[in-house]
Amino acid sequence: MQIAALERCQKFRADLLLAHIFANPQTRSFQKELAENSGFSSAGLTADQARVQEHVLELLPMISEVNAVSEELNKYRHFELVLLGAATQDDNQTKVMVQMKDVGTGNLWLWERGKFMNRRYIIQEMYQQFLDDDESWKTCPKDKDPFWDEVEDYAVGTSSAFLQSLSYSLDFEDKLQITDHRGLEQGNLTIVLTPCDAKGQSLGEDDFNEDPNELVGKPYHVKVDVRDAEVYNSRFNHGLYVKYGCSFAKEAKDHHKTKVLTGTLAPSWKDSRMISIDKVTDEIIEIFETDSINFTVMAVQKPGDGSAPKVPYKNC
């Protein structure tokens, strides 16, 4: 609850900051001073937090500008800032991205900061054509239109399975909450982690160890089962799958993907994979004790028919 309240407070501050910036469109140094006066001081922040804050302050006015152009040109696209938590990133750094939404189909895209800034530049050129009564922008080919992008799979949310039970050769089974980038619940995902022998047979009760250090120097095997899920949003029924990687085994660090199941919001993948470690090290024990496997639930999106929504843009 405290985290949710903090996020609401930060969003409110961001909205206030954005209003001030547009009321006083001056220099970047002024924006920095204003940010500090609005509660965005960089004092006491980590390097990652300071970088994120700088990118947020940079992107907020750009996003507002692009949304205004989209509405003016009836492009039926809406943009918003998105923060992807460090825990879900391979480099353990928070990622600042921009989400584009097709307000007609509901399709979503996540753009890297650099891609958005490049698109914004082209959008500015398109808007200048509009202001100059140059109607060539209306016949811009789809693949040249800065508001268009290929439909791609979208991350519904992530679920984290903590690994501490593996330190004691114990099974882990849970129905985990699927959480999106806003921290909102989007469904649940059933995951099972089962320590096993080299043939994939589950360990017996006698194989339990009280001290994780007993595993050091020995081989270790674990089965990762992605069983089933329940997803709440009906627009994601075109196809659902799960992808994940395991930081404690070299051959499993790359993302493994389940099969895609279509036409359902309650997919049952029954996907099983055995991961083997040749020799447990102190580093692996540390991972077991403190880390998790992040499972990302992905949704297949379908392109629209190209027609504009039947309601005015401002009502979408």
Predicted feature locations:
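Long, low-complexity, serine/proline/glycine-rich intrinsically disordered regulatory regions
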Residues: M1-A68, K75, T194-C196, G204-Y220
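Alpha-solenoid helical-repeat scaffolds
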Residues: A161-G217
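A structural signal for beta-strand and strand-to-loop patches characteristic of beta-rich domains
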Residues: D211, H221-V224, H255, T262
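Short amphipathic, basic-aromatic surface patches that mediate peripheral association
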Residues: D225-R235
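Peripheral membrane lipid-binding modules
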Residues: D48-R51, H55-L57, S70-K95, Q99-L184, ...
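Extended alpha-helical scaffold domains
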Residues: D206, L215-R227, A266-M274
